[in-house]
């Protein structure tokens, strides 16, 4: 039973890994305001070839973001020209406005025929993390296709989403589609660093008085075959994100010669401090959030006694927590995590270093705040010789609604059932990763993070790692999902007002 329970909980963790140059145009003509008939998501052989070639071309543009101060701006500009080239219908349609924001990000405004319907936003980003060639089976920016698999940096994070959004819209427009509900497409150029493009787009929309029905960004996946004897896939939609804090610890001492060292050096003091942090994890916060929801939904799929344990987390919380903290992934969803990422000290082998610095990254559980984690950290270190400098930080994101009246969540759920009929379990989760959507909480209470892609355990390592890849079939299905989602959003249903939950 213990082994089976660990497997179940491991599944839960995997999920968490889970502007302005303006070309203005007219909206749809008054005679075009009738509701369009449903367009089937069936693509010709020529269209399928064109869509995969478009993705491969996008991968070949090295839109690398190294830091908030350094990125490949030439490639970022080239990518803007590229989407104009491969999606001519999108950029030439009369009821679509395209704006370049913060020099390289892009905002598309698609004017719907029914102004009474609240608009929504689809998001993605086209910048990627660096990809040194060592360890790659093919050059990381080759976009090479082998046996139905496209390789390259950005195939999973997140050029596939960028291209799928525009590709789906292009195919709909070619079929004379006119949306009833207006929507926006936001493409960020620096999500992997500062997110200034997304911040500027959010501010721009707010200045125009826009309030959104919902937002869809990158996030959860469809997980399959993660647990022995559990063969049902599960779609995990992230309804929140953990917070984050980058904290620098610093020790200053008088420098000197190593032949007459002091009792403690700056390196020794700092090493002891970060060691205490690693050996004293933040408290477990199980609570009644998305983890409990997922466990309870999975409970019915298992026999006694696992089903009893999972369906009653309030009773078995100590047991479940003990199992979850044994695995790094499951541990990350029940507490704030502590990761030492940078250590700097010393300039010469015979010189006592005057300064030692260490940077620690905390991913903050929704049950805590930045200030609470900072105070806990100071108490754990308990050494007044160590200075603390917050480099960057933000609190956990609010939890978006996932009930029957949550329009965005239910549209995603409906589209999952349509495109992936074999998936009959959809659950809300909290993402341990962060996205550009965190800059849009001023525009909606419904922010959802979801990749319409099946993911395997080894695929997580490829995101930001070597040999990132996506199958042609998976990408085609991603395009199909967006194609269907846009049409599903033309419902008369409107979102019910929700307050953000923390």
Curated annotation (Swiss-Prot):
It catalyses: an N-acyl-L-amino acid + H2O = an L-alpha-amino acid + a carboxylate; an N-acyl-aromatic L-alpha-amino acid + H2O = an aromatic L-alpha-amino acid + a carboxylate; L-phenylalanine + (9Z)-octadecenoate = N-(9Z-octadecenoyl)-L-phenylalanine + H2O; N-(9Z-octadecenoyl)-L-leucine + H2O = L-leucine + (9Z)-octadecenoate. GO terms for molecular function: aminoacylase activity; hydrolase activity, acting on carbon-nitrogen (but not peptide) bonds, in linear amides; lyase activity; metal ion binding; peptidase activity. Zn(2+) 2 binds at residues 125, 157, 217. Keywords: Glycoprotein, Hydrolase, Lipid metabolism, Lyase, Metal-binding, Protease, Secreted, Signal, Zinc. Zn(2+) 1 binds at residues 157, 192, 464. It is an enzyme of class 3 (hydrolase). The active site is at 127, 191 (proton acceptor). Pathway: Amino-acid metabolism; Energy metabolism; Lipid metabolism; fatty acid metabolism. Its cofactor is Zn(2+). Its EC number is 3.5.1.114, 3.5.1.14. Gene3D superfamilies: 1.10.150.900, 3.30.70.360, Zn peptidases (3.40.630.10). Secreted enzyme that regulates the endogenous N-fatty acyl amino acid (NAAs) tissue and circulating levels by functioning as a bidirectional NAA synthase/hydrolase. It condenses free fatty acids and free amino acids to generate NAAs and bidirectionally catalyzes the reverse hydrolysis reaction. Some of these NAAs stimulate oxidative metabolism via mitochondrial uncoupling, increasing energy expenditure in a UPC1-independent manner. Thereby, this secreted protein may indirectly regulate whole body energy expenditure. This is N-fatty-acyl-amino acid synthase/hydrolase PM20D1. It comes from Homo sapiens.
């Amino acid at each position: 039973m213990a082994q089976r329970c660990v497997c179940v909980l491991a599944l839960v963790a995997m999920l968490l890994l889970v502007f302005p140059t303006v070309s203005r145009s007219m909206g749809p003509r008054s005679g075009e305001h009738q509701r369009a008939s449903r367009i089937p998501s069936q693509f010709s052989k020529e269209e399928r070839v064109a869509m995969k070639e478009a993705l491969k071309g996008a991968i070949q543009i090295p839109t690398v973001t190294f830091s908030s101060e350094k990125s490949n701006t030439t490639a970022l500009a080239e990518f803007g020209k590229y989407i104009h080239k491969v999606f001519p219908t999108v950029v030439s349609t009369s009821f679509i406005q395209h704006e370049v924001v913060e020099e390289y990000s892009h905002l598309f405004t698609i004017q719907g025929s029914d102004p009474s319907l609240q608009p929504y936003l689809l998001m993605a980003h086209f910048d990627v993390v660096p990809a040194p060639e060592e360890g790659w089976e093919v050059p990381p920016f080759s976009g090479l296709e082998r046996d139905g698999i496209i390789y390259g940096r950005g195939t999973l994070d997140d050029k596939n989403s960028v291209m799928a959004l525009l590709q789906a819209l292009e195919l709909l427009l070619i079929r004379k589609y006119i949306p009833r509900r207006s929507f926006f497409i936001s493409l960020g150029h620096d999500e992997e660093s500062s997110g200034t493009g997304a911040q500027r787009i959010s501010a721009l929309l707010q200045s125009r008085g826009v309030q959104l029905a919902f937002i869809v960004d990158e996030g959860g996946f469809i997980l399959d075959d993660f647990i022995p004897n559990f063969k049902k896939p599960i779609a995990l939609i992230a309804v929140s994100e953990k917070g984050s804090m980058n904290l620098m610890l610093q020790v200053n001492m008088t420098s000197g010669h190593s032949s007459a060292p002091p009792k403690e050096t700056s390196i020794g003091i700092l090493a002891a401090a970060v060691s205490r942090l690693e050996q004293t994890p933040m408290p477990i916060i199980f609570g009644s959030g998305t983890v409990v929801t997922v466990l309870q939904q999975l409970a019915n799929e298992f026999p006694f006694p696992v089903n009893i344990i999972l369906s009653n987390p309030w009773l078995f919380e100590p047991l479940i927590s003990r199992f979850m903290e044994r695995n790094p992934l499951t541990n990350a969803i029940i507490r704030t995590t502590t990761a030492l990422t940078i250590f700097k000290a010393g300039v010469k082998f015979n010189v006592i270093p005057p300064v030692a610095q260490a940077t620690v990254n905390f991913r903050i559980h929704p049950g805590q705040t930045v200030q609470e984690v900072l105070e806990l950290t100071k108490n754990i270190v308990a050494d007044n010789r160590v200075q603390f400098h917050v480099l960057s930080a933000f609190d956990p994101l609010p939890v978006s609604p996932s009930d029957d009246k949550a329009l965005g969540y239910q549209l995603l759920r409906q589209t999952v059932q349509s495109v992936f009929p074999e998936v009959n379990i959809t659950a809300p989760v909290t993402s341990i990763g962060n996205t550009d959507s965190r800059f849009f909480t001023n525009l909606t209470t419904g922010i959802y993070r979801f990749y319409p892609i099946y993911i395997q355990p080894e695929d997580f390592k490829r995101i930001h790692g070597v040999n990132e890849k996506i199958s042609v079939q998976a990408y085609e299905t991603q395009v199909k999902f967006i194609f269907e989602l846009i049409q599903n959003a033309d419902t008369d249903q409107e979102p019910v007002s929700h307050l953000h939950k923390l």
